[in-house]
Amino acid sequence: MLADAKPGTLPYISIQQIAVKKGGRKALYNESEENVVLDEYRKHVAERAAQGIVPKPLDASQMAALVELLKNPPAGEEEFLSDLLINRVPPGVDEAAYVKASFLAAIAKGETTSPLVTPEKAIELLGTMQGGYNIHPLIEALDNEKLAPIAAKALSNTLLMFDNFYDVEEKAKAGNPHAQQVMQSWANAEWYLNRPELAEKITVTVFKVTGETNTDDLSPAPDAWSRPDIPLHALAMLKNAREGIEPNEPGNVGPIKQIEALQAKGYPLAYVGDVVGTGSSRKSATNSVLWFMGDDIPYVPNKKGGGVVLGGKIAPIFFNTMEDAGALPIEVDVNNLNMGDVIDIYPYKGEVRNHETGELLAEFSLKTDVLLDEVRAGGRIPLIIGRGLTTKARESLGLPHSDVFRQAKDVAQSTRGFSLAQKMVGRACGVDGIRPGQYCEPKMTSVGSQDTTGPMTRDELKDLACLGFSADLVMQSFCHTAAYPKPVDVQTHHTLPDFIMNRGGVSLRPGDGIIHSWLNRMLLPDTVGTGGDSHTRFPIGISFPAGSRPVAVP
């Protein structure tokens, strides 16, 4: 599989090779008929537009066809083809990203050409791909005097380096000035400081859902098959009528017109509710909310981040999932906030005021000041990975610990002992025990992924440029969809097992049984694990259920 290829080996891939791998139609073999690919894509765009949603990102077959078209672009299609290359290919280690990275690397090395992409532009575009297959060509370019400054800038803002960090470090120690520049940039946390700080005042329009919002309201279980397709799945958000909510088609399509009317006021929307995020579908629920109320992520198709959620109470795992997406979740009294109100949020002061009158509507305190760093970094996980990169760079350069980032507050010292759970988490963090409220990053030994969340976890793994698991046991099951699979489930049954196993995981097969009964036989005592299922509970050791993105991190 293309996804199995390691960064550092990016052979040029032809459209014919991809067509064979994918069982592509005959048009993909014939360069004179490549315009058929464009026609098919435009047909897909029109079909999705009729549903009110954007097209899917390019897959490997389409990306391979695009490569051939970019080499010899049809007259009048130049801008369209460039936009597809820049904005419609998933980042990370997606198969289409492999084709894109290999093409751009070939241009940078002079192995192929395109009138639309210069070697300098190729390196610049490689720098937008976040991590994975783009890293090795960027590191190689540090030795090219003409391309090195562009590659250094790209790498300075790239977090998903993992073991490739040592390749840059080696070049820096060997005297490469551009590699030294990258190391110094990482050490200075410029990847973080170059991003805008959270604004002193955030003006939003209230989208209020009274009472309790369960994740099933935001990501209905009958529509679970569409969860990986974020724009399509978001159409089902709040599709059932309730107080203050007016679905376009009750039972089928949520309040799209109502959302658009509020957006017409000219401000981003904030999701507001009395109780928000209870239930088990946290990641897909977060995706749906942010699709309407979040910010576009540059160069990343069909996914959004940022956004604001205000809740009288926000369920803990939903809160964490919002953090991971770079959103600002705030627990605050929402009684004075009504649908359609325009409000000003002052995150540093802890105030919510009426935008027109300045009237104080509510006061709050953030759960932790580190939340401000998370929003600036683009999410909790980018912050964790980025801080680690900065720490490694500073250690390599012999510099003291960075003071750029906010630190979690120390918990009060105690002479009391630890419970067994505190000891197990402590062992996973390399200490004797963990006190309530103490920040730690435990090593996950066992990870479970089931089939209704597995495709989303796969997408997260691709985004995180994962080519191998660090957890000792990662298990994927198909216990939710084996009995009555939809067509999309059948496709998942065929493709997900290899994806997991090629990264060192264990994949059950449809009909093998329930994930918990398998996982529980393989657990190690006194270890910590997680699972993409709200009822993940270990009889040995300790587990923390999580959304699809945290499950992808171990």
Regions found by a protein language model. Give the residues of each.
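Amphipathic alpha-helical scaffolding segments comprising HEAT/armadillo-like alpha-solenoid repeats
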Residues: 60-67, 91-110, 130-142, 161-172
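Structural detector for internal amphipathic alpha-helices that build alpha-solenoid repeat scaffolds
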Residues: 51-56, 79-95, 109, 116-131, ...
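Fe-S-dependent hydro-lyases/dehydratases of central metabolism
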Residues: 143, 150-554
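Short inter-helical turns and helix N-cap capping residues of alpha-solenoid HEAT/ARM repeat scaffolds
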Residues: 74, 114-115, 143-147, 176
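N-terminal mitochondrial targeting presequences
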Residues: 13, 18, 28-33
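N-terminal polybasic/positive-inside topogenic patches
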Residues: 5-16, 24
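Amphipathic alpha-helical packing elements
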Residues: 30, 34-67, 72, 371-384
